[in-house]
């Protein structure tokens, strides 16, 4: 875990703490997203192992203490056991971090996405979608990571800028009348070419539509076709369609009903091919096969080099290569560019529900509102159904077996499904009803589905998993109120959860989405393990304290990227320490005094101050109710400092019952204002700095501040501002002038003022008269001179001894 997790988890926690204080029963679970490719890769590297599903389970296996240089092959069950072992150890560390941070999770609601409970929920959801026709199995072009050797979904892609070259290649016309030149960055796909394509309105190629050309090196006759996705401005304006270079190739292949000549295997190497066959017709099969024999089994880069050399020698490569830098699709956790491989996968039918899913996005309340456009853009840009199959090991298995006929051929169209009461099941070890283990992988027997679900296929059901789908609890909490998350997983976690809830419950899964930004490094670059600029949180907690770290996190507004800033953490630490000291100071003046009533607040300056406090309560509450926690903190913190720096200094003499003109009513008014304000501020700050507020709250209250009622105007009574409005603000302005003059003269703030002369409008002077005694005590003023004038003027004359 890094500082970015602390950032977003703090945002969720301050909301949970606020809601709890308003009297809500807060459902706040902790889920561990254990399964998936990152966990497998970590286990492989940590233990020095790799999974080989063909190996038998070894119950005595124990990984070496130090990971060997050469990875050890182990069975799937042994591998999964190591995944559980490592994730459980990680969770202990993670849990310790969240507790140190003060995240107020209900640990009785803890769950894991790989637990038996989560697997049963995931498998039930899959079976019910299958029954409703919302999920289907198909052999189709699939986005494929050749290192992980698994399918990935559109949501898991990212573009990375990579160098490349445009290759201008000549295709001879089939009628011998000349040639057509195309430009491509992937000449290695030439043996997979099935057509050329241009825009239907491109005058350069209109006369060629319906004619054929011959592929260089392989002599395969392919048509020239028209399609609106062809870009007249890109390359030569006419493109090569191959099976498959990118998702546009897939679209052309599907919409133009083209043949399949897929040659890249799951390991990223070129598969065998027989030119002259029905799949690879060639007018010069011997030559084509002779050339292709040198490509079979090679990597993409190796084949590219061989093809370019062959094109050069044949004269089909026109001119020099044109260097470019262009975006290349990668799996977000992968190291090599994605390929498109034909394979059998399970898909969720999302494309035909696009409009309904867009409508769901409009129904959802987004915080901040502009984040809805990211969801909308994602849904509008979908070009394939959601692939939920992964060819990996540590995940939720698909609950399906398939019968085999007398020849051992698998019938994928007639899956054998378990009863819901049998879930969770693992088809690689469990046996379907009516069969015995001896019939596994045999003719007239069965095979288990070998794949596991995409991690988002499980995480998309977090409301059902955490809420115990089908129970009274689930009926009570669904749909949930809030989904807090980061913006980069809108297209994955949020979208997939909306999809599943739309299908399963015909509703949104939650009413609000609170979206956090990224944490940036000091150079304002996104933190990334691969870049090496990740900051871990525990050293920061040890240095500055959890309250300080939370303060920094809560200062980042929803949806806004925020740089890590230890200076901001120091401010948070100062706030926590000041809360401690101010509480100690105020409570020292209230010792032995019962909690006062607002009715005791009678002095004009006190009434004005409480009126300002009421405004802060209103503003902080309104901000929290719109999930703008940063605004609530900003407003509360600003008022806290004016309370400490100004109000406490103004009234502390009166609160002691000391000074000239001291009265019992004046003392009582000051003490009541101090006590009520301290109580309110401690509660307003509690969601942000929970440790120090809990400490000071228990000094004078029973129970926890975190279940104390959130401040409301009713507890401030009927206190209204004084007749002379803005007494407190005007007195503070004068006090600041006194302090400024003392600082300018480089004398102690304790030094006295011989004369404080104030010229100003009558209303302002009336306000100052109402606070004259407090101002005299706080500023050390011996004498006042108040004169009416149109504008305010303050003259401070320090005592001679002070100069």
Regions found by a protein language model. Give the residues of each.
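Short Cys/His-rich metal-coordination motifs, predominantly Zn2+-binding knuckles/fingers
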Residues: 148, 218, 334-336, 404-406, ...
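Short hydrophobic alpha-helical segments that form membrane-spanning helices or hydrophobic packing faces
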Residues: 139-141, 193-195, 341-343, 402, ...
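Charged, glycine/proline-rich intrinsically disordered loops and linkers
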Residues: 48-77, 278-295, 413-440
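Feature 926 captures the class I aminoacyl-tRNA synthetase adenylation module centered on the KMSKS loop
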Residues: 168, 384-457, 461, 503-546, ...
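N-terminal, positively charged nucleic-acid-binding surface of large information/translation enzymes
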Residues: 1-201, 225, 242-278, 311-357, ...
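Short, polar/flexible loop-turn hinges at active-site or ligand-entry regions and domain interfaces
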Residues: 49-55, 76-81, 296, 538, ...
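Structured ligand/cofactor/substrate-binding pocket environments in proteins
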Residues: 4-16, 32-33, 118-121, 179-310, ...
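Active-site-adjacent bridging/hinge elements
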Residues: 14, 64-70, 95-102, 219-231, ...
């Amino acid at each position: 875990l890094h500082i970015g997790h602390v950032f977003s988890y703090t945002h969720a926690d301050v909301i949970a703490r606020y809601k709890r204080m308003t009297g809500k029963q807060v459902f706040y679970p902790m889920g561990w997203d254990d399964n998936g490719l990152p966990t497998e890769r970590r286990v492989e590297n940590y233990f020095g192992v790799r999974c080989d599903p063909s190996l038998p389970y070894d119950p005595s296996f124990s990984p070496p203490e130090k990971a060997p240089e050469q990875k050890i092959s182990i069975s799937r069950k042994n591998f999964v056991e190591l995944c559980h072992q490592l994730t459980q150890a990680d969770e202990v560390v993670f849990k310790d971090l969240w507790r140190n941070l003060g995240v107020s999770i209900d640990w009785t609601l803890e769950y894991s996405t790989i637990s038996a409970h989560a697997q049963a929920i995931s498998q039930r959801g899959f079976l019910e979608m299958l029954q409703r026709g919302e999920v289907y199995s198909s052999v189709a072009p699939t986005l494929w990571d050749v290192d992980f050797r698994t399918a990935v979904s559109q949501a898991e892609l990212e573009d990375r800028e990579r160098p490349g070259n445009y290759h201008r290649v000549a295709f001879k016309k089939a009628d011998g009348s000349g040639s057509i030149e195309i430009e491509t960055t992937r000449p290695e796909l030439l043996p997979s070419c099935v057509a050329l394509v241009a825009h239907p309105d491109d005058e350069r190629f209109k006369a060629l539509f319906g004619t054929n050309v011959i592929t260089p090196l392989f002599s395969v006759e392919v048509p020239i076709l028209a399609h609106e996705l062809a870009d007249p401005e890109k390359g030569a304006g006419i493109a090569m369609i191959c099976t498959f270079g990118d998702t546009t190739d897939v679209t052309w292949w599907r919409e133009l009903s083209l043949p399949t000549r897929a040659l890249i295997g799951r390991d990223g190497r070129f598969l065998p091919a027989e030119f002259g066959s029905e799949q690879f017709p060639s007018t010069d099969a011997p030559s084509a096969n002779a050339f292709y024999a040198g490509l079979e089994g090679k990597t993409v880069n190796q084949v590219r080099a061989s093809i370019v050399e062959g094109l050069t020698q044949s004269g089909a490569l026109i001119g020099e290569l044109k260097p470019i830098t262009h975006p290349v699709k990668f799996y977000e956790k992968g190291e090599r560019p994605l390929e498109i491989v034909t394979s059998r996968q399970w898909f969720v039918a999302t494309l035909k529900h696009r409009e309904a899913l867009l409508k769901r996005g409009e129904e959802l309340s987004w915080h901040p509102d502009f984040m809805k456009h990211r969801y909308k853009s994602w849904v509008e840009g979908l070009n394939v159904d959601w692939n939920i199959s992964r060819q990996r090991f540590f995940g939720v298995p698909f609950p399906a077996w398939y019968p085999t006929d007398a020849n051992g051929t698998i019938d994928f169209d007639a899956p054998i499904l378990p009863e819901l009461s049998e879930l969770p099941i693992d088809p690689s070890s469990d046996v379907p009803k009516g069969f015995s283990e001896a019939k596994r992988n045999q003719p007239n027997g069965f095979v288990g589905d070998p794949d596991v679900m995409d991690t988002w296929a499980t995480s998309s059901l977090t409301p059902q998993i955490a809420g115990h789908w089908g129970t009274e609890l689930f009926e009570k909490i669904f749909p949930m109120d809030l989904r807090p998350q980061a913006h980069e997983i809108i297209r994955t976690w949020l979208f997939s959860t909306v999809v599943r809830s739309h299908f399963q419950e015909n509703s949104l899964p939650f009413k609000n989405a609170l979206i956090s930004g990224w944490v940036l490094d000091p150079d304002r670059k996104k933190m990334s393990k691969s870049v090496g600029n990740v900051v871990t949180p525990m050293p920061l907690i040890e240095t500055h304290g959890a309250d300080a770290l939370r303060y920094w996190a809560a200062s980042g507004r929803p949806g806004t990227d925020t740089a890590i800033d230890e200076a901001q953490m120091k401010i948070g630490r100062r706030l926590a320490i000041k809360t401690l000291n101010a509480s100690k100071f105020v409570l020292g003046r209230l010792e032995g005094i019962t909690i006062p009533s607002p009715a005791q607040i009678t002095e004009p300056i006190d009434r004005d101050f409480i009126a300002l406090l009421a405004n802060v309560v209103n503003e902080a509450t309104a901000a929290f109710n719109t999930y703008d926690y940063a605004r609530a903190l900003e407003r509360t913190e600003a008022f806290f400092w004016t309370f400490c720096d100004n109000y406490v200094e103004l009234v502390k003499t009166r609160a002691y019952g000391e000074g000239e003109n001291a009265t019992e009513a004046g003392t009582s008014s000051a003490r009541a204002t101090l006590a009520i304000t301290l109580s309110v501020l401690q509660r307003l700050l509690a969601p942000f700095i929970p440790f120090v507020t809990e400490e000071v709250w228990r000094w004078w209250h029973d129970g926890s501040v975190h279940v104390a009622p959130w401040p409301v105007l009713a507890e401030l009574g009927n206190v209204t501002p004084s007749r002379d409005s803005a007494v407190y603000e005007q007195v503070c302005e004068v006090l600041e002038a006194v302090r400024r003059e003392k600082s300018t003269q480089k004398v102690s703030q304790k030094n006295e003022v011989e004369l404080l002369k104030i010229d100003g409008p009558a209303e302002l002077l009336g306000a100052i008269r109402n606070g004259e005694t407090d101002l005299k005590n706080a500023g050390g003023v011996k004498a006042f001179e108040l004169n009416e004038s149109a504008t305010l003027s303050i003259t401070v004359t320090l005592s001679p001894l002070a100069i």
